[in-house]
């Protein structure tokens, strides 16, 4: 099926790279999933969000390191031709870079031998109504790659704001299949980066701010046929709960709670969408993700714990069966949508036992670490001592001990709630440095006032029920009045090894490298590199626009590059993007980022750096006009 008209402009060595991968695996496992794992092991590639299934956003490359990072210079750049927020990161496989954009969700394949040359582009025709029901700008978080097999060539997958998932030929850009995953008539859109496991491509859903009931769906990579769909709320059979669901931790809750923790049919419009990042452990065959906030935001309208919104899930990829779910914020009152990054590591716990861990910095201001084989809660630490809605998380029960002063009930206008609805962490993809055993966290340092109100549900319209005022916080601490932080966190000890303040939220995330560097980006348009041991700032560069994507690195022809998608927008940028002035507009974000327009403006693209700016274009003959070429 081909509803688009991609423009093929050349060939690359992508097919050769895949063929080489197959050759390497002839005496080893030969499934496409194993090929993807092997491709991810090569640090020259960046084949998926998070770089590999561990989602550590970590590179073993050391060519760029503490000693020479000051020599980084722009090597080449590419403009997407699209405004609005550019989230996520490009993919690199062999000699190609694949780039996505926010709406209209154009996909580009670029030739790394002649950087920036467009080999093909696939620009869909979408229902423009999708723009009117998008919550917080018309963003998209990335692409997924499947390496192909002896029947089907390699594929690139993208999601579209209008609710479709699309499979494209990675060599030509031709659309292979397209399926409708979400119904924009009820406000359900798609902004998530697809995720490939085995012969499946997984996608979540968006739209909790419009009362959309959340779900994750698995499609056959070759045909687009739906294999399974699992909801976050409702009857157990629709949640795909395994027979032994939460058996190791029955205190988390087990059966029938997707109905019993809601009043009446409120679960049908109860949110729990998942538009964030996934991780996967092939050894236990579980993938991990978070379900988001319940709907509406006004907690008075939905009594109960509202399971299974706000949960960390461990599901079997093949069947979709949930082995465990841990609800972090029962009966969420603050829009602490729990869809943030899941990073996998193997570390010794405090008793010296080696554990397979999952670490998740949540919007509610807590960093959770679980045993990813069974869901055991290992630790739950505050990201910052200003987190005040919760006093502590009890490790034996998993429950938060709340401070009622910062609740959002109808008879109480709560003030100085920390964090704000944006969370102390949001969509940024953070990183884990396995050498130093620390997580590099990008933080939003924003608090809020909250005033709830009642409203009816109307399909396809916003279903929030609260007016928010946000500001850098806490207001009483002038020396910590910046809106962002970068921190190095030890999940075993609970310590922050170092932390640095930023003017604006570190919305885009971090990348750690074996060169002893932590790269990250800022809303006012900087990409920075800090010493991973000390936090000292070693290098920075001002980009053409603010950044809400996250850094990546790759190697081509023996040279390491660092790349970043830039383009301000997303929730923190809606005031700038849509020219809003009311501080409560943009669900409260306009007030928090009122100064952003003093530092950056819109514009989308990719900037690539190398030592001394070296690239294929260091040879001035590369890319020059060749007599006889078509014009």
UniProtKB/Swiss-Prot annotation:
Catalytic reactions on record: 2 Fe(III)-[cytochrome cL] + a primary alcohol = 2 Fe(II)-[cytochrome cL] + an aldehyde + 2 H(+)
Organism: Paracoccus denitrificans
Name of the featured protein: Methanol dehydrogenase [cytochrome c] subunit 1
Enzyme class: oxidoreductase
Role according to the record: Catalyzes the oxidation of primary alcohols including methanol.
Family matches, as SUPFAM superfamilies: Quinoprotein alcohol dehydrogenase-like
UniProt remark on cofactor binding: Binds 1 PQQ group per subunit. PQQ is inserted between disulfide Cys-135-Cys-136 and the indole ring of Trp-275.
Active site: 335 (proton acceptor)
Lineage of source species: Bacteria, Pseudomonadati, Pseudomonadota, Alphaproteobacteria, Rhodobacterales
